[in-house]
Amino acid sequence: MLQYSRYPFHPPLDAYVDMALVAAWEAGATLLGYYMRTEAGMVRLKENSSPVTEADLESHRVLVRVLRQAAPDLPILSEEARMIPHAERAPWSRYWLIDPLDGTKGFLKRTDEFTVNIALVEKGAPVVGVVHAPALQQTFVAVKGAGAYRLGDNGQWVRLSTVRVDPKRIRILASRHHAGPVVQRLLERLTGAETVSMDGALKFCLIAEGRADLYYRDGPTMEWDTAAGQCILEEAGGVVRTAEGDTLTYNKVELVNPPFVAAGDPSIDWTSRIRSIFENGDWMGA
């Protein structure tokens, strides 16, 4: 298990950070065991045509075991478990939302950019977020109201902070496997834009570190894809907004997220600016 100094989080949520870190690191070690093999185990396609491997399922089992041992009364909603009806989920005021292997396609292609995502959700919002990238040996954590941090090489927690955007040099994140036509149009219309390719929840973390500015996702994502990363980015000073300008919320009737923009500079009305780009071709038109 990784060694780390105590982080600057306070009760009562600090106990949940400990639980999430232990679970993420144990699941990450399990994933690395599969990753080092020639094959990641049997691969099958889910109903939405996304791949799932033995590694996904074993990571799920590890997370559920560790989290239930630590907090047996907390419900767990996982990508790799049965779909729980909203009528059953609606009364949950606090629960774990987990993605045991975010970036399965990258995992299979050996990009190193797969993660374990764990969020503690309260009343529709993520209040604890952990994103662990085992192949990169990187761990990110955030607590609502207490900031976002990356675990440094020396075991110390490094506070994360987003940066103000340079409109002449916008660094736009694009998924390696999901860059849709709307994102392509955005890249074409932004003069001087730089593209940064990254898989999964690490896109939120790059913006939180100030290494990228903008991530626009028009394709489908699920709540477990975004909750932990959203918590990290927002606590680093960034924003995550829907096309209507609303914050992403959780434990909805349908677990599919709407299109959204994640950005580091909160001083900009990103949804209006992006709309202006498509309508006028002018970044400063909004």
Residue positions per predicted region:
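Short loop/edge segments at beta-strand edges and connector loops
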Residues: 78-80, 199, 244
